[in-house]
Amino acid sequence: TLFRSTDIENKTAYEYWNAFTNQWIKGNENEATVLIEDKVGELSFIYNETHKKWIIAYFNADRYNITMRTAEDITGPWSEPYELANGREYAQLYGSYIHPLSVTGDNLYFTMSMWMPYNVFLMKAELADMGEF
């Protein structure tokens, strides 16, 4: 969904991506298509100006991890999933909200929540360690 911040309460101004027509469709949510073929929860995204890429992070319950993908355009194509954190190392993890400090530089900062202890942690991933980033 795309909209200006001044239009947040005006749903008729919202635009929805449609991959079949390869364009944004204004005011018709039913025309929206899926951007990422994956189980996505607690999604956040940011444009990293240093690397000129969109970064999307989300919780995937099936893989029990926090996943990251990148794309040169917000509409894709999106990279294969990259695991930022997993439930084997961080039991009962969820959430994956990207911190605004990630807009530039070689680090991705994101918050990760855990049920036990019930808390939120600031995490850091080095983008250079992610291969073809």
Model-derived regions: residue spans:
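Conserved blade-ending motifs and adjacent loop-strand segments that build the rim/top face
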Residues: 75-103
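Loop/turn-rich, solvent-exposed surfaces of beta-rich toroidal or solenoidal domains
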Residues: 36-75
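Blade-level signature of beta-propeller repeat domains, shared across WD40, Kelch, NHL, RCC1
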Residues: 98-133
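Surface loop/turn motifs at the tips and blade-to-blade linkers of beta-strand repeat domains
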Residues: 34-39, 84-90, 112-113
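Signature of short aromatic-glycine-proline-rich micro-motifs recurring in repeat-based ectodomains
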Residues: 31-45, 94-103
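Beta-propeller fold detector
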Residues: 9-31, 79-85
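Hydrophobic beta-strand positions in blades of beta-propellers and related beta-sheet-rich domains
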Residues: 14, 66-71, 120-124
